[in-house]
Amino acid sequence: MQDENIETWHILFPDNELAEFLRENNFVERYGYKFIWRNKSYDNFEDYLNIFKSRQRKNIKNERKKISELDISFEIKDMKNLTNKDWDDFYIFYKNTYEERLQRPYLNTKFFKYVHECRADLRPVIFFAIHKNKKIAGSLCFQSNDTLYGRHWGSLYNIDSLHFETCYYQGIEY
């Protein structure tokens, strides 16, 4: 990696074989927390809500209601209908969210273009939040046959409950 001038290299969710290979080759394994949601045969979002106590259900419904009352809707784009413009829009949201926290985004437009043009096998899905016919936020996920991996998100505005709706609830409904 030094020959390539690479400072760090991160692999998210390696399968068991790759994880073992990395350990055997002295890569450092990082342990952290992650949220994994499992669909336990829920037919819809309401079924999912029924696992919670009444107060928790009410809180989630109130969060979703806030977004709905702001007239924010959602558009789901996958590899079949993602365009270069969609990737450009997502990058603007992603970059803005980092810059608001005085940080530099660690992924650049080249990465997103590469995913779009060369890595259809990752099966990207972007959940776009729409307000007044304009995209205002997005959450990027990758999918396998039975798993939706979410990690990247961004928004133009700091709107209460928008992060959870875009990153979690939309993915659960999907």
Task: Give the location of each predicted region.
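A conserved beta-strand-loop-helix scaffold within acyl/acetyltransferase catalytic domains
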Residues: 2-160
